[in-house]
Amino acid sequence: MDESLSKSLEYAERLSTFNNQIKLLKEQCLENNILYTQGHQFTVDLNLINYCLTLMNIKKTNEAIFLDDYKLPVKITDINSFYNNITDLYQRNLNQYFVEYNQLVKDKGEI
C-alpha cells in the first residue's frame, strides 16, 4: 500500500476514534445530569436552573409546580433547596466533563 494512503487511513482512524470518544463523553455528561426527586425525573440543564432563578428572583421560594421530563406536574415545596441540588449536580458534572475532555485532547496527541 502506498505510504501516503496508509498515513491517511491511520489519520482518519485516529480522528474517528477521537470523535467517538468525544461523543460518548457528551452523552455521559447528559446522562449524569439527571436528578430524581419525589418520584420524578428531571434533566438538569440551564433552562431548569434559570427557571428556578426566576422563581427565586420574584420571591416565590416556598412552592411551585414544575414539569418533569415526562411532562408530569410536580409540586416542589422548597425552591432554594431544589435549586441548590440541581446547580450542585450540574456543576459537578460540568467539571467532570471538563477534566475528561481535556484529558482526551491531551491523549490524542498529534492528529
Language model features with spans:
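A preference for well-ordered globular domain cores
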Residues: 1-111
